[in-house]
């Protein structure tokens, strides 16, 4: 996928609020190694490096465009690397991931895989968007179905009616308990975003949800796709104000030891 960091940061404050809450959930702990999985442009990775100045802090992301912005955030204990979360190597005392794991399937298996990279006594801290059932996403899937030929049948979750990999807080807690985790906290929180009509909501989705679709379409088909999606959004939100109740799931867990 081709990410646009400038587009993503057009709603910087709304996107940063859940990350700050996740940071606040991380308990005090000695850290030698910290990793930020799906670090994007690296602002939160830098915050981790400042909070744990004696630790080696790694920001990992698959997007060259995002990491190009991150390279400017120099600190002696901070480095960035391009790579896939599923190819993670090494062991860590803190594994942090803000709004990234929702792009990966099978979260019970994913958490088990990440858990193997967490040192005893270490903490896993994760935030994922949980708005897959929001009307805006359903309308996006409808638009993808309309463009099935151009997209080769692709939709965000694999099939036209595929389920999101994101779980409920209770299910995440159960999975973590099954891994032997202690001190588990898992919660859901709504972060309201007020947007200027359907056009504002389209601008919001351009930073995230639209990315995998537009990455698969040429310029002309991409413009047609956006126009068809915007028409659906305007039909649902004809006014000049959209109240977007953005739900997020946040959880932390400590590995005994």
Predicted regions: what they are:
Residues 1-32, 43-47, 66-69:
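Conserved class I S-adenosyl-L-methionine
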Residues 96:
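A conserved beta-strand element that flanks and buttresses the S-adenosyl-L-methionine
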Residues 108, 115, 123-196:
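Conserved catalytic/acceptor-binding region of the Class I
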Residues 33, 122-123:
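Short glycine-centered segments of the SAM/dcSAM-binding site in methyltransferase folds
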Residues 33-37, 41-88:
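Class I SAM-dependent methyltransferase SAM/SAH-binding core
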Residues 43, 161-257:
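Conserved Class I S-adenosyl-L-methionine
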Residues 104-105, 118-120:
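Helix-to-beta-strand junctions that scaffold the AdoMet/dcAdoMet cofactor pocket
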Residues 99-100:
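Short catalytic micro-motifs in class I SAM-dependent methyltransferases
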